Amino acid sequence: MNKKLLSSIILVVFVDLLGFSLILPLLPYYAETFHANAFVTGLLVASYAVAQLIGAPLLGRMSDRYGRRPILLASIFGTFLGFVLLGIANALWILFAARIIDGITGGNLSIAQAYISDVTDAKNRAKGLGLIGAAFGLGFIIGPVTGGFLSQWGYAVPAFAAAAMSFINLALIFFWLPESLTAEKRAEMTVKKPAVTLGALFVALKRPFSGSLLISRFLFGVAFAIFQTIFSLYALTKFNLTAAQTGYVLTYVGVLSVITQGYLVGKITNVFREDILIVACIALMAISMVGWAMAPSVLVLLIVLAPTSLAGGVLNTLLSSTLTKAVAPQEIGGILGFAASIDSSTRIIAPILGGALLQQLGTWAPGAFGAIVMAGLFFYVRAQIYNHPIVLSFKQTQLEPAPVTMQD
């Protein structure tokens, strides 16, 4: 494992996510200045996900052919342009254009993951990829509160600050980050690979156990993405929180996420079977989403956010982990590709659906809808995943007390 290259790319990821997290919580406030209602704000958030769904796979293939470094430079330059356009926006359509430009060039994270795979060996790869989660959490601790603070001078200021982060990233990559793929490796990787087609996805969904996990991931993804994408709009509409106050709340959520991902997941998966934890997290999340829907005050909301973040973070990790254990080693890449496509679809559906529910029914509706989805998922998982022979087959490996590979 090349620690210098790994440290360099993790720094690039952190700076990129810092810029992203500066902006994301402020979009509903920015859109409101152009008289956008909740549904239109949901469309604004979804426009980025739609563009990213189109752009990220293309950028990923281009990075295989032309190398990680030039495509990462192009991707972050697109992010830079999107943030600048966001800062100078004087009409709602320009906000949409800014998010679409950022989304279509938004392959930053997937290319960084590929770079890490290039510079780590099989033993250390999981550890290297896990550092992205740490960078993500740290970015979401610092970014929202910084963006909220800067917004007191206008919403354009955080946008230009995010653009500055992207410019710094361009300089870091240009002057400091070497290419990770040799010409020989690029030639090998241009061999045509099986596409993640809609037909292939339907075939995967019909498989007895892994198909059930993918369906569970979709249902969980819709409920959790509604919480993530609508939260700022919910905070503005229900509690009239300022952008700065929402930033403080999201920083609190970021701290909870870092604790969950960095500490709790490893501890509890060494004690409990994964299917038991999945069922428990679904139940906890369903209950906490009822609390989110009905929270009468910000204090109650902060209390409710703790189990929501805990259950959501653990469940997201467990569904991915169980999915990779449920298929043959040569199928892992393909099944994770399907999971990524499902995640992208939930980030498109959730903000539109959540915005419509909030506008038409009220601030209680997104949380209530999420709770209903999670309650249905509870019974589905109990029937299809809990105590399944495949889960029981890898139970003993998980509980062994000498988990060197588990820690990696």
Regions found by a protein language model. Give the residues of each.
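Short amphipathic helix-loop junctions that connect adjacent transmembrane helices
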Residues: 25-38, 229-245
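Helix-to-loop junctions at the C-terminal end of transmembrane segments
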Residues: 56-67, 260-274, 358
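Helix-loop-helix hairpin linking two adjacent transmembrane segments in secondary transporters
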Residues: 132-175
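C-terminal transmembrane helical hairpin of 12-TM major facilitator-type secondary transporters
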Residues: 273-319
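Juxtamembrane intracellular "pre-TM" segments in multi-pass secondary transporters
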Residues: 178-215, 399-408
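A membrane-interface helix-boundary motif in multi-pass transporters
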Residues: 151-164, 356-374
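Conserved MFS/SLC helix-loop-helix module at the cytosolic interface between two early adjacent transmembrane helices
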Residues: 53-92
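Cytoplasmic helix-loop-helix junction between adjacent transmembrane helices
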Residues: 97-137
